[in-house]
Amino acid sequence: MKKIALIIALAMLIGLSVNTSADANEKYRIVWSHYTGWEPWQFIMESGIMDKWASKYNCQVEIILVNDYIESINMYTAGQFDGCTMTNMDALAIPAIGGIDSTALIIGDFSNGNDGIVLLNGDSVKDLKGRKLRIVELSVSHYLLTRALEMNGMTERDLTLINTSDADIAGLFITESERDPKAAVCTWNPPLMQVRNVKGANLVFDSSKIPGEIIDSLVVRSDLPDNAKKALVGAWFEAMSIMSSRSKEGQNAIKAMAKFAGGTLREFQAQLKTTAMFYKAQEAADFARSAKIKETMEYVRTFSFDHGLYGENAPDKDVVGIEFADGSVIGDKGNVKLRFPAKYMQMAADGDL
């Protein structure tokens, strides 16, 4: 009997070692799209930083660029990737509402002027009344517009929205500005930078007025193994350390990112100024624990429900739960699909990765 027990124990041990080995060779795929705060992912991949951290945690990580932002999120939601760069609003509206339990593993930055409203012959949000405004509907620009109107005692009924793709929005505004003295647009960088340069154009509201509300993160499947999460967080904050240093290595990293982004160094540096990057892991962890993120997600889920992003059959905005770093939940505690933990960012801050 003891002999049988020994054989069973050995078999279990062998099986465990085989599974561990398989996990060690597991390959994870991360997708990102072009945006100032996400350009570091290409640097992380090309510099070898990702390979170094993946090797440390016995896994492989592939980082892939997909130019179409929404398509990248759809691919993640469909199971083609283990993680994806996206905003807090899109993380709720697409994967979370779609039933994919997702975690904002790395809070990289928040928009601090990268999104804005520009119009001709006007100097305030109230001058939008009665106008037609070009915008990517149901995007973070739409959220920004809603907040701007709310803060100025207005609603969307006070103007007409013209749904426009982000690829066309700058060109169309520039063309319209030549014949329409009331042309107006709401967009994000780099198109925002282009429309602001139009003669007579005024920026009347931008995301610096709602700091901490348009959040850019690396979102991963909540069941992504611990070693992969640690490798990703370690690689990201090593890149942040390089990027924020005044060293030649840091300068070269930023030059490389500007090149990846398809713009000049000056343009990229200007966009960085309107992006509140969390260069230090402690800052990111503190933000994840802040009351601000709870307040923001309340705004975001209200906007998402009011604009039909929960689907026509959703009875209310509580059908999906959102969990925060302190364990508190807004929405259905039995159906948590979006999480904002501080755990791994804090580990990076404490030097525990």
Residue ranges and their predicted role:
Residues 300-353:
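Conserved C-terminal helix/tail region of periplasmic/extracytoplasmic solute-binding proteins
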Residues 7-16:
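Bacterial N-terminal signal peptides
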Residues 25-173, 178-189, 204-206, 212, ...:
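Short, glycine-/small- and polar/acidic-enriched structural segments
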